[in-house]
Amino acid sequence: MVLEATMICIDNSEWMRNGDYSPSRLQAQTEAVNLLCGAKTQSNPENTVGILTMAGKGVRVLTTPTSDLGKILACMHGLDVGGEINLTAAIQIAQLALKHRQNKNQRQRIIVFAGSPIKYEKKALEIVGKRLKKNSVSLDIVNFGEDDDEEKPQKLEALLTAVNNNDGSHIVHVPSGANALSDVLLSTPVFTGDEGASGYVSAAAAAAAAGGDFDFGVDPNIDPELALALRVSMEEERARQEAAAKKAADEAGQKDKDGDTASASQETVARTTDKNAEPMDEDSALLDQAIAMSVGDVNMSEAADEDQDLALALQMSMSGEESSEATGAGNNLLGNQAFISSVLSSLPGVDPNDPAVKELLASLPDESKRTEEEESSSKKGEDEKK
């Protein structure tokens, strides 16, 4: 296994926004760099990898050579895109970072991802290449994008020729297409190195060729932490989607329930209104009838019947009084002995001198005497009052 310190130069220029490499040049490059860092650190525990960017406001070192893969991958997030790459300055700064490596036994290697046009002339690039060769620094170049630029491959080939010593440097031209940038690089010397593919690279290539054999295309035997992180992330996303779907279903059910409640309330109000309308109709009818009676529009037959009953009662009352007076007059006549005696004497066959008739007449009260007594008693009462 080769003990090596590597600096990877990333192209973050404006051309990385293009989508000729899925999903974009920058994303495809980032995936390839992540896989390359894993291959380097897994091939030898003492290998170190550093990252720098070539565009933007200037060349910027994201991390110096380190064996901490987590630190290397973390510095790749949130890259700024813009400007043009400064290839010669980036190579010189990468060489300086390798010169200050902690383990001097490590071989030095620079890997350049060039996805945008090269503005430098061949002569300037050859000068930089010769300097690398003098300091025993190997160079790998990944040329992608700008397929119609014929000068770009020639410039990069000239740079590689100036650096190459014992075929320790390599260049890979990756045309745009359906294949991912990382998948193409897996079988190239950039990944496999001069001594053949390591176990990590071979397993990664097998996973890329048959990614459906493992969850998320990652073999848990090679990188269990990555496989676990991907699985946890997928479970969290699934739980979030299920919660969102459940919430949407609950909201839809609540809306339907509210609609049914509103419909039932409207029906209840309508029924109550109909029920209340009937008594009001009756009250209105009674009110109309009372008004009609007050203006004389109602049939007064019942009142006429009551008047007839009242007249009949008055007539009966007066008849009773007349009968009482007649009875009183009759009683007065029967109480008069002279009248009875004259009546009996006028009857044929009746002898007024008969003792039985006389006894009967004697038993009758003398009305005249009673009248005189009443008059005398009334006079005495008047005298006493005086």
Swiss-Prot record:
Function, in words: Plays a role in maintaining the structural integrity of the 19S regulatory particle (RP), subcomplex of the 26S proteasome. Plays a major role in both the direct and indirect recognition of ubiquitinated substrates of ubiquitin/26S proteasome-mediated proteolysis (UPP). Binds and presumably selects ubiquitin-conjugates for destruction. Prefers multiubiquitin chains rather than single ubiquitins, with a binding affinity for 'Lys-48'-linked ubiquitin chains. Acts as a potential docking subunit for both ubiquitin receptors RAD23s and DSK2s.
Subunit structure: Component of the 19S regulatory particle (RP/PA700) base subcomplex of the 26S proteasome. The 26S proteasome is composed of a core protease (CP), known as the 20S proteasome, capped at one or both ends by the 19S regulatory particle (RP/PA700). The RP/PA700 complex is composed of at least 17 different subunits in two subcomplexes, the base and the lid, which form the portions proximal and distal to the 20S proteolytic core, respectively. Interacts with PI4KG4. Interacts with RAD23s and DSK2s via its UIM3 and UIM1 motif, respectively.
Location of the VWFA domain: 5-190
GO BP of this protein: DNA damage response; leaf development; leaf senescence; pollen development; post-embryonic root development; proteasome assembly; proteasome-mediated ubiquitin-dependent protein catabolic process; protein catabolic process
Residue(s) carrying Phosphoserine: S263
One Pfam family linked to the record: UIM
Disruption phenotype: Displays reduced seed germination, growth rate, stamen number, genetic transmission through the male gamete, hormone-induced cell division and increased oxidative stress tolerance. Is also more sensitive to abscisic acid (ABA), salt, sucrose stress, heat shock and DNA-damaging agents and shows a decreased sensitivity to cytokinin and auxin. In flowers, epidermal cells in petals were larger than those in the wild type.
Residues covered by the UIM domain: 221-240, 282-301, 305-324
GO MF entry, a single one: peptide receptor activity
Name this polypeptide is given: 26S proteasome non-ATPase regulatory subunit 4 homolog
Tissue and organ expression note: Ubiquitous with highest expression in flowers.
PTM: Phosphorylated by PI4KG4 in vitro.
GO annotations of cellular component type: nucleus; plasma membrane; proteasome complex
